[in-house]
Amino acid sequence: WANVKGPPMIYAASDVSQSTIDKTLKWYQIASSAWGEFGPAEIWIVGNSKETVSDLEDLWCDIRTEKDTKWNKEWDCANEYWSPFTRYVDDGGAAVSTYYRDYIDYHFFLVTMGPKYPSPEEDDYKVVTMHEYFHIYQHAHISNIDDEGSSSAIRDEKMGGADKPWFAEGGAEYMAQLLYSRQPNVRSNYLKEIMDRKAYSIGEYLDYGKPLKDLTYSDPVQTYDIGTWLVAYIVDKVGEETFRVNFYKDLDGLGFEESFKKHFGMGSDQLISEFDEWIKQPVDELLKIIP
C-alpha cells in the first residue's frame, strides 16, 4: 500500500447527517495524522433505513465499476446472496475490508461505519473510527495480494491468524483507546477506567482455559478485551514505538513470529504464557502499567 496524502473518499446514505460525516472524517484524520496516512481508502457510512442502504449499495456498484473495469457486477455488487452494507442497519458496528485482490485492478481499503453500536452520538464512535483506522495501518504493512489461496493465508497469519482476534483486535483497540485518551478535554483517568472495565473479562478467560491465540470470534470470551490487555502489557515491556512502528516495519519481511521475537524479546507462546501469569494479579496491580 502506498502512503496516500489527503482525506479518504466518503460516501454516506441519504439519512446520515452532515455532522456524522464530519465527525467520522475528523477522528479518522486524527488517527492518520498520528500513525501515518495509508490508502487509498473509502469510508461508507450506513444509515438507519433499509431504503437508503439500498440506494447506497447501488452507488457502491456504480463507483466500483467506474473505478475498475474488472469489477464483477454479478457477484461483487449487492445481490440475493450478498450485500456490502445491509446488515449494518440492524447489526450496527464497523469494519475494515481489504480489497487487495488479484482479480481486481483498483486496490483499496473499505471502512464501513454502522448507525449504532456505537451510534455517532456516543464518544465510543470516535474511538471505533480510530480503531478501524489502525486496522488499515496493520494491513498497510502487509504486501501479499489476496488470491483466495496461499497469499490470503499469509495475510491472515501476519495479522495473528485467521479468525483469531487476539493480536489484530487487541492492537487496534489499545492504540485507539490510548490515542483517544491523549486528546484535549478527555478526562485524565479515562484510559484506566476503560482498562478496568475490560479487566472484567479476565476471569472468564482464565476459567475458559483455551489459549489466547486459539480463541476465535465465536468463543464465549471477550477476546478483544484480553487482547487489549496483552497489547498494553507488550507496550509496557518494550515501548509504544517498538510495538507500533518497529514490529510492523519488519512484519512483511520477517513474518509474524520472527518480527514478534525480534521486537518483543520472545516468541508469542512464551510471551502469552508470561502474560497469563501476570494477569492473575489484582486489577489494581494490573492498572499500574496503564498511563
Protein language model regions, located:
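Alpha-helical transmembrane segments and their immediate juxtamembrane flanks
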Residues: S273-I290
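Acidic/histidine-rich, surface-exposed loop or edge segments in extracytoplasmic proteins
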Residues: W1-Q18, M113, P211
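Zinc-dependent metallopeptidase catalytic helix centered on the HExxH motif
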Residues: Y88-M195
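Surface-exposed intrinsically disordered loops and tails
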Residues: C77-R101, D147-K158, Y208-L215, R244-V245, ...
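Zn2+-dependent metallopeptidase catalytic core
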Residues: Y11-A95, K126, M130-Y133, A140, ...
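Surface-exposed patches in mature extracellular/periplasmic domains of secreted proteins
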Residues: A34-S49, I145-S151, P184-Y190, T242-K249
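Active-site-proximal alpha-helical
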Residues: A31, W166, G171, M175-L179, ...
